[in-house]
Regions:
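Flavin (primarily FAD) cofactor-binding/catalytic cores of flavoenzymes
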Residues: 1-190
Length: 190
């Protein structure tokens, strides 16, 4: 039956791509249709290889370029966003407002034929259960390179802990090394 994909990030567009290949179903899309996309491969190398070579993943979040990257909308990588959105069976419907019984309400219309809903709005952190932990406006722990305001509590692998690469397998090692040094120094002081 007809489907609805909610969410315009990498996962949302990848799922939209896969399920809209079957032209016999209408797929409604509720997400950002203005997002930029980048190819997964460029000149025979992965985009992540290029990011590493040019230092893109190493910019500090405190540098002017790090601040600019961090405040920008992140592109969708490896998915032809414009191509998917031009398929005849894909209908962009704007923001999803509500649902009741078989009706889904969007900004400018109501659809009653949707049988499947895929919610791909991303991951949201939940650190509220850690008493005394200071959180930023996005719900992530306030920290300096993984060191929190609570003595002995550290974080690793969070987005933009220190660099763009902090949440990637290739970039986490710098943060891990820093945290290891902090912990060794603290243990030696005590």
């Amino acid at each position: 039956g007809d489907a609805l994909v909610v969410g315009g990030g990498d996962s949302g567009y990848q799922i939209l791509n896969e399920i809209s290949k079957d032209a016999s179903r209408t797929v409604y899309f509720s997400g950002d249709t203005t997002v930029k996309s980048l190819p997964q491969n460029f000149l025979g190398k992965t985009l992540w290889w290029w990011f590493t070579v040019v230092g893109f993943l190493s910019y500090s979040k405190y540098s002017w370029i790090g601040k600019k990257i961090n405040s920008s909308t992140q592109p969708v990588i490896g998915t032809d966003v414009k191509g998917i959105l031009t398929r005849e069976n894909v209908i962009a419907v704007g923001r999803t407002k509500d649902a009741l019984n078989n009706d889904v309400f969007f900004e400018k219309q109501k659809v009653s034929t949707i049988k499947n809903v895929i919610w791909a709005t991303g991951y949201r952190p939940n650190f509220n259960w850690i008493q005394g932990l200071e959180l930023d406006a996005n719900g992530y722990p306030k920290n300096y390179r993984g060191v929190s305001n609570i003595d002995g509590l550290y974080f690793i692998g969070l987005p933009w802990m220190y660099t763009r690469g902090s949440a990637t397998l290739g970039g986490v090692s710098k943060d891990a090394s820093y945290l290891a040094n902090v912990m060794v120094t603290k243990d030696n002081i005590k």
